[in-house]
Design a protein with these regions (language model features):
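Extreme N-terminal leader/activation tails
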Residues: 1-57, 73-80, 112-132
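Charge-dense, low-complexity intrinsically disordered segments
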Residues: 5, 9, 62, 99
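Amphipathic alpha-helical oligomerization segments
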Residues: 19-22, 64-101
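Short, well-structured hydrophobic secondary-structure segments
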Residues: 33, 60, 64-67
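Short loop/turn elements at secondary-structure junctions
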Residues: 89, 94-123
Length: 132
């Protein structure tokens, strides 16, 4: 298995884990009604949970399961695009469109992996490459 294949597998596994967590949380949107500060409500209007520390409720509501699932879906599109051309993503890419596409998508996928740098399976060699 090549390094790029391992990189794709690592990011896919993290997205799968995140999806499982979002689905376990109900998979739906949350909101913070202005009339009840500190409460986060689900789509039906029921209190999903409450948090009395000012400001956290809005941040948490923006990280709702539905939004997380949307982000995961778009991340998978990028990951699938990269997987098609990952073999062309090398330290010294050719100067053609396909290699440039692979290199650019590889940069994005490496950034996605770097979000999980604290994970025991993360490899430092997956850090994004910077070239001039």
């Amino acid at each position: 298995m090549t390094d790029n294949v391992r990189l794709v597998a690592f990011v896919r596994a993290r997205l799968d884990e995140e999806e499982d967590v979002a689905r376990a949380a109900g998979g739906e949107g949350w909101r913070c009604p202005a009339e009840v500060p500190g409460e986060i409500h689900d789509r039906s209007g029921a209190i999903a949970f409450s948090l009395r520390t000012h400001g956290y409720n809005h941040h948490i509501a923006r990280q709702d399961p539905a939004r997380t699932l949307q982000r995961i879906e778009t991340s998978r599109v990028l990951l699938d695009e990269y997987a098609e051309v990952a073999a062309l993503d090398t330290d010294r890419p050719e100067r053609d469109f396909a290699s440039g596409r692979a290199f650019g998508l590889g940069f994005v996928v490496r950034q996605m992996a770097a979000e999980h740098a604290g994970h025991p399976e993360y490899q430092v060699k997956w850090l994004p490459r910077f070239t001039q």
